């Protein structure tokens, strides 16, 4: 029996991860923490054995609190999910030479570079991996560059955050100015060429620079899409699991480029969001430094990076993790998701005909 800590338990992804741990290891003692006292994961029957409200990760009391919890509850390892916490844990490691408890995550340099979309865009500028992209701010909106360098239609989104924060297809300069005004609370954005093709996603596991395992899917429709001006809410309502090796290959080449650029090995879970252009060429729109929201539903169709992460943290190596850089699903599975219901997996789209 192990005692496992899951941070950010109010979020969809940490709850999904916890559900898989509970299914795979019913005897494990799971502790959830969140800075929000109303975190829904606290109150989901059967999900957790214990829960605690913790300080925010930027609070000076955060790590002393975590250290006490680890010591008092004899925690064996942790799933740290919110990206803000991952950055802080990386900083803790750099200062102390160790984590408060074993985790599986990459170094701070890679995490910081991928979390901020503008830094990622600068690192990948001029490559095949991203669309034409510039960074703009409320103080320097670069109207002329947006119009002449990027052109319309274009795509705008916040440099940090998930769930499509601050994103919209912009048709003209007037709409661009209006969007900045409406989102005056967001200090920085990236503006890029508009991509009209499929929205793809890929989750990958790296261990000390080795690409160990990866699988992909298509985000075809979004939950409550009509409530967001961009129609992208961050949660997929209908998705297709894909056996397209070119997606995995493209993402791995992108990571290898970043490894060389930053001088650090990829390590941990990296999750890509991609869009295809009108010709089907893939472009990276985001790389998350954690498990993605689909981790649980992917586990149910045979691609279980949650269990692989447990193996790595328990063994201290990746020897027991299957090498499957081009993982193929057994069937053309699809999934349906919505609010307040568990995802539904179907064996194909023939049921819709």
Positions of PLM-derived features:
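ATP-dependent carboxylate/phosphate-activation module, predominantly the ATP-grasp catalytic core
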Residues: 193-199, 203-259, 288-313
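Conserved ATP-binding module of the ATP-grasp superfamily
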Residues: 130-131, 153-155, 165-198, 256-262
């Amino acid at each position: 029996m192990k005692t496992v800590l899951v941070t950010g338990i109010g979020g969809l992804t940490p709850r999904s991860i916890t559900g898989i741990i509970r299914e795979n290891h019913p005897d494990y003692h799971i502790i959830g923490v969140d800075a929000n006292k109303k975190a829904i994961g606290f109150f989901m029957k059967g999900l957790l054995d214990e829960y605690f409200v913790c300080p925010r990760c930027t609070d000076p009391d955060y790590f002393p609190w975590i250290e006490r919890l680890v010591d008092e509850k004899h925690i064996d390892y942790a799933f740290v999910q919110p990206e803000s916490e991952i950055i802080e844990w990386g900083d803790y490691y750099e200062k102390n030479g160790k984590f408060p408890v074993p985790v599986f995550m990459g170094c701070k340099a890679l995490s910081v570079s991928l979390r901020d979309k503008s830094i990622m865009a600068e690192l990948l500028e001029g490559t095949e991996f991203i669309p034409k992209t510039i960074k703009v701010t409320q103080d320097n909106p670069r109207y002329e560059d947006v119009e002449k360098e990027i052109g319309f239609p274009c795509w705008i989104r916040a440099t940090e955050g998930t769930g499509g924060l601050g994103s919209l297809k912009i048709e003209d300069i007037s709409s661009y100015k209006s969007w900045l005004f409406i989102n005056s609370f967001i200090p920085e954005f990236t503006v890029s060429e508009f991509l009209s093709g499929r929205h793809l996603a890929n989750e990958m596991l790296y261990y000390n620079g080795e690409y160990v395992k990866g699988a992909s899917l298509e985000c075809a429709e979004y939950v409550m899409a009509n409530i967001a001006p961009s129609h992208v809410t961050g949660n997929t309502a209908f998705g297709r699991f894909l056996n397209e090796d070119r997606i995995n290959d493209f993402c791995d080449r992108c990571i290898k480029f970043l490894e060389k650029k930053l001088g650090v090995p990829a390590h941990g879970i990296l999750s890509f969001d991609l869009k295809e252009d009108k010709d089907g060429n893939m472009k990276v729109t985001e790389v998350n430094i954690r498990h993605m929201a689909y981790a649980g539903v992917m586990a149910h169709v045979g691609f279980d990076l949650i269990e692989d992460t447990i193996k790595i943290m328990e063994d201290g190596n990746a020897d027991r993790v299957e090498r499957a850089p081009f993982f193929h699903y057994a069937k053309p599975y699809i999934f349906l998701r919505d609010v307040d219901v568990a995802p539904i997996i179907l064996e194909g789209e023939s049921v819709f005909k």
